[in-house]
């Protein structure tokens, strides 16, 4: 992705929308035709271009990673793009991995390393620092996968934004739409 980014009125609108959904811990829906900047705005909001490689290639850390930890801590947001054939099980596993890894990075930024609590086996205990999950290309998800997202929202109280093409708002999942907090 290009280093150059122009902040447009639509990007500012997305940022305000995402901030509102995150603060209110609600479910938001963002849809529109291809090419209007939904994905680019979401990636920018979540600092995903900086963090994606670190979160994907999980392993030893270096001192330069502190900048990425700080960026992730700013909006406490994880971005997920499901594959075309994503099953509910794969969705659950992917979200668990992304949220856990993002939380660990945020924890590294907000807490002193010697202050992170240990469990009884001596490993670090990680709290959930992620406040918002953005799901791009959400029209790819089955009704069962959408129900899994809604269940996760209910249990973990993590705000959720679904991004997709026009028609996403016409989905038949009434339970999901009853929890909806905003549309952009």
Model-derived regions: residue spans:
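Charged, amphipathic alpha-helical linker segments immediately N-terminal to NTP-binding catalytic cores
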Residues: 1-5
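Pre-Walker A adenine-sensing motif
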Residues: 9-22
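Walker A/P-loop nucleotide-binding motif
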Residues: 25-46
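Switch/connector loops and helix/strand junctions flanking conserved nucleotide-binding motifs
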Residues: 38-39, 88-89, 168-173
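Post-Walker A helix-loop "phosphate-sensing" segment adjacent to the P-loop in P-loop NTPases
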Residues: 48-65
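Mid-core helix/loop region of P-loop NTP-binding domains shared across ATPases and GTPases
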Residues: 71-75, 83-148, 152, 159-161
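Conserved AAA+ ATPase core "coupling" helix
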Residues: 90-93, 174-184
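Sensor-1/coupling segment of RecA-like P-loop NTPase cores
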Residues: 141, 152-177
